[in-house]
UniProtKB/Swiss-Prot annotation:
Keyword list, A-Z: Acetylation, Coiled coil, Cytoplasm, Golgi apparatus, Membrane, Phosphoprotein, Protein transport, Transport
Modified residues (N-acetylmethionine): M1
High-level lineage: Eukaryota, Metazoa, Chordata, Craniata, Vertebrata
Span list, region Mediates interaction with RAB9A: 1570-1680
Phosphoserine PTM positions: S1475, S1479
Description of how the protein assembles with itself and partners: Homodimer. Interacts (via GRIP domain) with RAB6A (preferentially in its GTP-bound form). May interact (RAB6A-dependent) with ARL1; might be involved in GCC2 Golgi localization. Interacts (probably via GRIP domain) with RAB9A (preferentially in its GTP-bound form). Interacts with CLASP1 and CLASP2; recruits both proteins to membranes of the TGN. Interacts with STX16.
Domain notes per entry: Extended rod-like protein with coiled-coil domains.
GO molecular function terms attached to this record: identical protein binding
Segments of this protein annotated with the region Disordered: 1-23, 1468-1522
Primary location recorded for the protein, binned into one broad class: cytoplasm
Residue ranges, compositional bias (Low complexity): 1-14
Organism: Mus musculus
Coiled coil residues, start to end: 31-1614
A GO biological process held by the record: protein localization to Golgi apparatus
The protein's name in its UniProt record: GRIP and coiled-coil domain-containing protein 2
Amino acid sequence: MEDSAPDAVAAAPSGTPKSKLETLPREDLIKFAKKQMMLLQKAKARCTELDKEVEELKSKPVDGGTDDIIKVLTERLDALLLEKAETEQQCLCLKKENVKMKQEVEDSVTKLEETHKEFEQSHRNYVKEIESCKNELMAVHSEHSKETAILQKELEEAVHKQVELREQLKSQSDSEDNVRKLQEEIQNITAAFEEQISCLEKKLEATSDEKQQEIIHLQKVIEDKAQHYQKDINTFQAEILQLRATHKEEVTELMSQIETSAKEHEAEINKLKENRVTQCEASENIPEKYQCESENLNEVASDASPESQNCSVALQEDPSAEQTVCDKVRQLEDSLKELESQHSILKDEVTYMNNLKLKLEMDAQHIKDEFFHEREDLEFKINELLLAKEEQGYVVEKLKYEREDLNRQLCCAVEQHNKEIQRLQEHHQKEVSELSETFISGSEKEKLALMFEIQGLKEQCENLQHEKQEVVLNYESLREMMEILQTELGESAGKISQEFETMKQQQASDVHELQQKLRSAFNEKDALLETVNRLQGENEKLLSQQELVPELESTIKNLQADNSMYLASLGQKDTMLQELEAKISSLAKEKDDFISKIKTSHEEMDDLHQKWEREQRLSVELREAAGQAAQHNSELRQRVSELTGKLDELVREKSQNDQSITVQMKTMTEDQEALSSKIKSLYEENNRLHSEKAQLSRDLEALQAQQDFAHKEHVAEFEKKLQLMVEERDDLNKLLENEQVQKSFVKTQLYEYLKQLRASILEENEEEDVVKLIQAVGESLVKVKEEEHNLVFEYDARVLELENKIKCLQEDSAVQCEELRTLVRDSEQEKILLRKELDAVTSAKEALQLDLLEMKNTNEKASLENQTLSTQVEELSQTLHSRNEVHDEKVLVIEHENLRLLLKQRESELQDVRAELILLKDSLEKSPSVKNDQLSLVKELEEKIESLEKESKDKDEKISKIKLVAVKAKKELDSNRKEAQTLREELESVRSEKDRLSASMKEFLQGAESYKSLLLEYDKQSEQLDVEKERAHNFERHIEDLTKQLRNSTCQYERLTSDNEDLLARIETLQANAKLLEAQILEVQKAKGVVEKELDAEKLQKEQKIKEHVSTVNELEELQLQFQKEKKQLQKTMQELELVKKDAQQTTLMNMEIADYERLMKELNQKLTNKNSTIEDLEQEMKIQKEKQETLQEEITSLQSSVQHYEEKNTKIKQLLVKTKKELADAKQAETDHLLLQASLKGELEASQQQVEVYKIQLAEMTSEKHKIHEHLKTSAEQHQRTLSAYQQRVVALQEESRAAKAEQAAVTSEFESYKVRVHNVLKQQKNKSVSQVETEGAKQEREHLEMLIDQLKIKLQDSQNSLQISVSEYQTLQAEHDTLLERHNRMLQETVTKEAELREKLCSVQSENTMMKSEHSQTMCQLTSQNEALRTSFRDQVRHLQDEHRKTVETLQHQLSKLEAQLFQLKSEPSTRSPASSHQPSKSLRERRTTDLPLLDMHTVAREEGEGMETTDSESVSSAGTHIQSLEQLLSSPDTKLERLAETSLWHNEFTKEELAEKLSSTTKSADHLNGLLRETEATNAILMEQIKLLKSEIRRLERNQEREKSVANLEYLKNVLLRFIFLKPGSERERLLPVIDTMLQLSPEEKGKLATVAQGEEESASRSSGWASYLHSWSGLR
């Protein structure tokens, strides 16, 4: 009974899923096992003592009767029963405690979960706060950009004002007043800027002072904390002090490094500030120097002008003063040159200062980068130290787990979580404040940069004024050109109207084509949408039918399972009935046997009554012996109580030691926390010092990565710890089971051995028996010791194995962590890809919007041009018509009036003549005498009449001609009117066409609006895609949670099975103990029978045995004393062994920790040395670079001085080339516009293609994932159904077994009760009667057999009950899991269906957009090719024209050179003494020749066409080819050695002209070379464009094939079957027959067809696996 108590105690904690034993560490478990061993040994010792007492009682002489013996035995039995009840109560108490512990553990788990949730919520809140901070920063940045834009606008306005003021000042006559006003304005501006700079410097100083105060305050706080914590640190142990000392040394080194770096950084910042201040002062002094020099130059020029006049007068008067004038001129020229060189030097200084500023900014950025890298290194070091600290903390936590309970662990975990949260909060707040400070400093820097930009803009302003003057000159020339063009406009009006009509017709046709294309595209879209809707409906129907199919299958499977279960249950019931019938028959037989035995027992009872009187005497004697034994027992009990007191004292001492150790551990943890706080403070200071130089985005991303990484590490460490604890618990449970089995085995062996010894004792003498017993006990003890030693060695070996397993598990967990990290990286890469796709989509959207705006602008421009042209045409037609009408009418009226006057005159003259004739006739008749006189008059009159008639005829002819002219004029008028009417009709038609165009434009705008709506739909769909992606991520998380739940359930199932096995093993041990107790009872009964039989013999040998008993008692007492001494020695040795083991473990742990820490320290020292070496190398490199910089600066100064001379030469050439460059600019701008259009279209096409490919990839991935999920769900559903059916069958079988077992139990209990009654009767009969030994032995055998049967039945019953409970719980859990999985499966199916529909819609829209883009691309390509050809022809014409001009200019220049050389020769030959007039003549002729030459060049430049070498071409890339061609400026700036030699040899006046001519030659040759290079580039771009066209054609074909493939998506099942047949068929004719089917389904290219044909014939089987068509399989079938 005592053996069962520890077993029950051991069974109690292992029965629960999460008991104290599971949570205890390894050493506590070992201690617990040792305590159990001690208790077992005590129980064994007590059993041996009881056996000895029984033997002593047997050996004592019997004075009284057997009643005393029976009473003693009954008392013993009662005591044993009481002890059993006590043990059972203890077991119940332990169970209750176990339940309480379970509840506490569950509460703690819930608390942990709550804290974890709170931590996650806080993490989310922090992420939101970071995002809000980012948004705020972005808003501040946008505000800052707005402010900068406003300042720039203000600057531009100020520049405009300055320009206006300068123009006003130029209009004024007094230049000196203007200069003074400008100086005053500049002084005001400089004063304002100086005030701003001073304010900014004050702000900087204030911020730096605040930062320094904060740093001082923090240092004070850190010093106070350090003093406070140093007091606590001094209380630590010596080993920990040594470790911390090394740690402190490292920290101080880091601090010193940080302080030095901070000081260096501050010094560099101060240097930069000083440099900037000096730069500002220098930049402010430069304009003042310029002004002073300009004033000096003006004064010199003003002084020089009267001197030159005086000189010229003096020269005219004196020819001898020529030399002095020449000297003065030369001096003035030298002074001018010096001033110009000073001017150029000042310019160089300005540029040098700007370059210096840029270099300093670059150096500052470089320093920032270096500090950022140093900060990252320090952070890495600090992280390593923190990791080392965390490892030490984990060691400390392990020690805590050895000394504390689970509740304390949970409290510590909660406290750590809270501290981490607070730390993160503080860290976030500090970083936000640091970021704001950095932003403020950045804004101040930007302000300073703006100041420098303002100064640069001022310089640009002056340059612009110079350019303005040049533009004014150009404007005057353009004005003259415009006047010429206006005269030509009247002539070109008719041509323009005709061209306009043709353009209108072309536009109308283009608009009509575009409308037709749009309508066709919309119709195709509608058709596709209808097909998509129809397919969706069919798909939904199929999905609904598919949802019904698994339900029907599940119902069929359930019915089949029920049928099989019912059949199995029927068969089992039949077998049970048969077994019950057999049992009933056997029980009937046993009943008959029992009745016969009862009869015999009655007879024996009568005999026992007769013997009772004899045994009463013996009982008196036995009572006396019992009294002695009781005294002996009381002594033993006193000893036991003393030993228990000692044990209690030892336990107290242990508890005190534990408490002291826990206190030390707490102090250690506090010290560690103090050190961690110090490290944190140092880390925060480091962050403050370096946060000003780090970028905001990097810090935020690093923080997020660190948080995620830390969170993941914590989770991984917790999981590792849990796994290790679970594994250790399982291993220890197994070890305990093995120990219990071994103990039970040893017990059974001992009992068997004792039985054998007792059997031998009955045969041999009693004296020898005692000695043998003692020897046997000693031998058994020796064996027990050996077995214990073996067990200890086995445990050590198992411990080593467990440690190896733990290491392997740690390695596996590290591998899993790496896999998880790779997964995280993959997810981040996917995020980056998605962001890139989003950026591409947004860029495409913006490009489309820009295209729309451009189209709108072009449409508006076209409409405006149409309107202007129509108004111009109307006005012109009206003016023409009115002019024609007025002119014609006036001419006709004048002619008519003239004719009328003439006619009237003629008529009047005729009338006068007629009157005169009549008068003459009358007079002739009256006076015939006067006939002769008057005949002459008549003749004269007749001649006059004839002449008049002739004149009248002539006039009539003229009148007829005039009439004809009038008729013609009328006809022309009619024709003009008709033409006017036709023009009006044409105007009306133009207006109608305009209306049509406006309607088409409206339709186009509606199309654009529909396109906008499509874009909005696209945006919505993209948003839906994002939502679906988020859903997919959620589903993935959900699946991960499910997998975790499954793992947990499997773990729980394994735990339950292990606990089940433990319970079964313990039940077996309890049953074995019960059997042993029953065997002991039987043995006692046997001994009692033997004693009763041998009472008669013992009466005779009473006296002898009393003497022998006394001697044996003395010997026994001596042996017991020896035995107790040996026990004490054993206990001491065991305790020493335990202490030695503990010390060894502690020493090994400490040695491991110290070794790890030393390794860490060595690694850190190595890293520090490496870093120092790198820093030294970098410093050396810095020095070398500084030296290089100095040398380079010297070289730059020398080069600048040389460049100035060349620039002076180049300025004159550039002034001549300005006009040609401006003409070339327009052509190049047009070309660049075309190229930009082409590039933008290319980019749009590529983006659209990339989008299409991305969508295809996404579709393929989604479909493959869908197929995988479907297959996975199907397999999981089938597995769950199988497991459910199996578990249901098991449950039914177990229920049937439990029913049968219950029935058997009821039968057995009834039989056992009857058997008890019989046993009592038999005992009563034995008191009265004495029966023969043969009958009693037979009854005993029968009893033993029956008891064995009862034990077996009990074991079976318990097993069946346990299995029933387990199966029921498993069934419930599996059913719940099955329901949840079914629900999730249905949800997943619905979501996949919706996703498929949405993706198909998106695919349709993308395809329609792709077709539109293709058509647009083809049109643009045609346009570009035509434009390219036109440009090529124009460039070739220009090149030819330029070559001709170049030849002409070369010839003219050669002529001029020959003339000049001749003149030079003449000048040299002439004597020096010559009049001043003669000296001035050649110069005048030279100047005249120069002036005559220059217009020739100007005419050539005017005659040239556009695009011949503008400065803007230098910056613009003409082609996309990789050939590098020098720009015009580079060609012009390149020095020419021949020209310099010519310049050195010739005189000053002649050198100037030659240089100009030579430079013109070189510039023209260079421009020709430049144009040749441009032609080559255009040809290269054309070649590239042709290659791109080929690629685009191939891609279009591939896309068309892909579209045709998508038609066969509906017949995937058929395609799958065809492919499977093709794969599994042997190569030959059957495979070749399937080729056309595969070709039609997959739309293969000719190469792919050829490869498939070779595969079908049996060639290249391995190569066909990676062929083109196989790569497309995964997008439909998910085979890959």
